[in-house]
Amino acid sequence: MPTDTKRKAHDQEPTADSSDYDSDGSEEPDFINVDFDFRAPEEIDFQALKRLLQQLFYTHNTKLDLSSLADHVVKTSTTQGVGTTIKIVDDEDQDPYAFVSAITLSSEKKEGSEAANSLSKYLLEVTSKPSSKSVHDVIKSAASSTSTNAPVIAVLHERMVNMPPQVAPPLYKMLLEEVQASLVSTSATRPSHYLFFSRVFSADAFSDDEAMDEDDDDDDDEPSGLAGARKRKAKLARREAKKAGAKKDAPKSRTISDGMALAGSSDEELGLFHPEDIAISKFASNSLTYRFPPPPDASDSFEAPLFGRIALVPADKMDALLQQIETDLSMPAPQ
């Protein structure tokens, strides 16, 4: 049985403050110290885990049994010691800001397999087109109830957008250690691949013409409430992209913390919510990116198109992947 509190991580998160300027007018970022508590998922986290899963699968969330998946995260922690949530120290009763867990894909119909069945069915559905056959075949052969092939373990991870990306390396490292320990203790077959699922967004949605039109709009015409906030946020993002040289001149490997978060993909530039996706894509043997259907209020809320991304990383590449993520997202040395 896992202990309640796993580890603590000390991090620094920048915050904007209008008073943070020196005498020559340049801005000096302010920092607040935040102690993160890496904890085992608990029953109290169930609803928050469902919300994070809903965020992860976006408009496809209705295709999955989110309750079974959230329940799996809690039970896997209790029975196998696998999985972690992140909370603020001394705020343990509040909702987690992030979670990570693992689930072995399976189509076997038995009690307790609802989460694995739901996720496997969804992944097989979205990879069913001929263009995604390589991804589909790996998942299908591993999830089949009659298969003798090595399994595929899906990594479930989501975090709040404003979480510093430096929380990712310890989360993934702990998860891999826990999964490997669980495999040894249960004498289970080692996986052939780890499957990573994430969201990305369309940077192409913010065209230069749209940016110019938005900048010329009268602010009094902006909608109020949440729709207005989203429109102002989109306008700010477009302005920042123009300052960086617009889309055609912007680097294609930036992350969301840099503004538009561009990553080259086919004819469309895609932005990353999780910067570690760059390393995951690098080590993936197979991958697929597909578009989510827009929500009903997408046109009113000026919401950019979102995509789902599946990446299959061979199990023997996981150690190297974790080292790369740690290198990419390491905290800068204190001044």
UniProtKB/Swiss-Prot annotation:
Pfam families: BCCIP. The keyword Cytoplasm applies. It is found in: Cytoplasm; Nucleus. Keywords: Cytoplasm, Nucleus, Protein transport, Transport. InterPro entries: BCP1_family (IPR025602). Coiled coil: none annotated. Residues 1-32, 210-259 are annotated as: Disordered. Transmembrane segments: none annotated. One of its GO terms (cellular component) is cytoplasm. Residues 19-30, 210-223 have a biased composition (Acidic residues). Residues 1-13, 237-252 have a biased composition (Basic and acidic residues). One of its GO terms (biological process) is protein transport. Belongs to the BCP1 family. Involved in nuclear export, actin cytoskeleton organization and vesicular transport. This is Protein BCP1. It comes from Mycosarcoma maydis (Corn smut fungus). The lineage of its organism: Eukaryota, Fungi, Dikarya, Basidiomycota, Ustilaginomycotina. The gene is BCP1.
